[in-house]
């Protein structure tokens, strides 16, 4: 693996610096980690660590997530992607949220768990309402 030379502190810093929120469950469906604890869109208490994700996942989308995880475990799916509109501020204005799930597998293809990630595209919403000139060299 190309990350073998990284120490634990560096790996943790890298995970926190990712421009997405990440949650990981293991092969037994237990929540084993997440990043960006203080600033998450989908906040969760620390007591969620070690819980079966079914106990702490929003009921509205649980059936779909169960289907995705079951398909990942059976090997018929490796990823899933969808968008939702979600109010993220007190003003109630909805923002586009990209949600993706990725099967975690070892080099033999054995299912190790699932990584879910989500990202808000608030900055894209502002581009719709403003005329923005490209100031970047590589636009």
Feature map (PLM): residue ranges:
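Sensory/regulatory domains in signal-transduction proteins
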Residues: 37-127
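Juxtadomain coupling helices with adjacent low-complexity linkers
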Residues: 4, 8, 119-139
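Short, contiguous hydrophobic alpha-helices characteristic of membrane insertion segments
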Residues: 1-2, 10-11, 52-60, 134-138
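Sensory modules in modular signal-transduction proteins
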Residues: 2-30, 34-39
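Generic signal for short, ordered secondary-structure residues
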Residues: 1, 7-8, 17, 32, ...
């Amino acid at each position: 693996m190309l990350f073998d030379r990284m120490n634990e502190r560096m790996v943790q810093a890298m995970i926190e610096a990712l421009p997405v929120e990440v949650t990981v469950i293991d092969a037994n469906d237990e929540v084993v980690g997440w990043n960006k604890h203080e600033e998450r869109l989908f906040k969760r208490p620390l007591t969620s660590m070690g819980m079966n994700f079914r106990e702490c996942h929003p009921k509205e989308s649980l059936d779909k997530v169960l289907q995705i995880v079951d398909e990942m475990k059976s090997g018929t799916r490796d990823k899933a992607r969808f968008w939702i509109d979600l109010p993220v501020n007190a003003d109630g204005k909805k923002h586009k949220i990209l949600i993706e799930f990725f099967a975690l597998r070892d080099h033999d293809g054995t299912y190790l768990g699932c990584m879910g990630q989500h990202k808000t595209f608030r900055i894209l919403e502002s581009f719709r309402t403003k005329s923005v000139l490209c100031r970047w060299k590589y636009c």
